[in-house]
Structure formats: structure tokens, C-alpha cells
């Protein structure tokens, strides 16, 4: 059935659902203290506070010299890196356009593309000591499906980190609860000395997201 063949009443119900959903989102944004704080402090997104909180707990940015930001748009995480590690070389990538950030090299391309890893490494001019991934697949509202789609991105990010990180380096990634994390954690524990997970206060309570923090990269076999 084409869109034009739909019952007008059905179209109206769908429109009402979209309107209600948009209204809830807008209300949440307007009443979110992190959104207000981000705007007041000049951060591009409330997500900046997630990295700030993770860094305060795990010391991720101390001594960072080369940092990769996977899923950089709109740029909040790279802003934090730039402020806390001003001497670090920062490279980010995202399918979505990202406004320039001083001192940050940004690639507007798909991280899953074959040429992406080489482009990132070439821009860094050396192995990264921190790989950040705030990537998430477009959600469909079904927790298990959203989890699996995002896990595909996370697994690719882990592979990139293991192939490129300097010994002693760290990896941070967003995941969604869903019960298929066992293999991911096993790979991380094999390659890093410590692997922990955290849900920073800036993560919304009703969100199933959490972050995996892997530190002390053991290095690649010779």
C-alpha cells in the first residue's frame, strides 16, 4: 500500500504519535540540567560531561599525546580532550558533518569504510594512546536490536584499537545493555590489564547505555 492509500485516520494517529514524541524530547531537553550547563559552558553537547566524568574517575586524558575520537559529531568529546590535553594530537571521524574544532583533524566519512583506519592513522603520525568511541547505530526503539547494531560498531572500534594503540594505551566505548557483551569483554581482558564499566552521572537514567573502559594495553605480539 502506498503512503497516499493510507486511511486518513491512520495518518493522523501517526502524526499525533510523532508530535507527542517530539514534545517529550523537547520537554526533556529544556528541563535537562546538563543541556543547560553545556550551553552555558560552551560545550557542543551534553555528552561532553560524560567524558569529563569518566576522565575524573579513570584519568583517561592524563598525559594523552594522540587521541582518536570515533563518532566525533557534534564534537563535545574532542572539545573536552582539547581543553584537558591541549598538546595532544586529536583526530575524529563521523558520517555526520562536524563544525571545525581548532587543533582537531576531522574526517567526514564512514568509520566502517575500508580506508577509514588508514586515514586516521596517517593523520595521527604515530600510534594513539587513547581511542574513544561514542558511536551508536541509529536506534529503532527495540532494546535488543539497538544493542546488536551498536555492538557491531563497538567490535570494529575494538579491532581498530587493538591494531593501532601504543602499549599502555586505553580504549573507551559506549555500549547498550543487551546481554551479548561476553565476547567483547573477553577480547578486552585479553588485550588490556584492566577492564571496567561505568555509567557516568551525565548518562540519562532511562538510557540503557553504559561505557566500557579498558586501560593498560598490553601491545601486539611481535
UniProtKB/Swiss-Prot annotation:
Positions bound to S-adenosyl-L-methionine: 75, 77, 94, 110, 134
GO CC, alphabetical: cytoplasm
Family: Belongs to the class I-like SAM-binding methyltransferase superfamily. RNA methyltransferase RlmE family.
Extent of Basic and acidic residues compositional bias: 1-13
Region (Disordered): 1-22
Subcellular location: Cytoplasm
Active site annotation, chain numbering: 174 (proton acceptor)
GO molecular function, one term: rRNA (uridine-2'-O-)-methyltransferase activity
Protein name, entry field: Ribosomal RNA large subunit methyltransferase E
Keyword terms of this UniProt record: Cytoplasm, Methyltransferase, rRNA processing, S-adenosyl-L-methionine, Transferase
